[in-house]
């Protein structure tokens, strides 16, 4: 599975490496039961799912995560740090849900309205 880097184009900062969860099982498992979240995860949400269809849960998570909700225009529409066992629905519908190690949003200076892009990394 190819890794990509999440870049905040607005601020010129990196949010780190991610993998895309493209299968049902990879989306279902997500980052559950992992202590090491050096590589984040991107969930691609089907078009037309709406705000509640973009929501996530933190069931069976062992560590907090930073989560970015990004629309089809690659703009951040919401961001949050979630603790294990929380449920969250974004303020606006998202096309991509990006799960990252806690602190990545703060360290990159990422804010709602910023533009994000994915760049290919070497495996």
Swiss-Prot record:
What Pfam families does this protein's entry cite?
DUF192 (PF02643)
Provide the transmembrane region boundaries. none
Per the similarity annotation, which family is this?
Answer: Belongs to the UPF0127 family.
**Protein name as catalogued:** UPF0127 protein MTH_1377
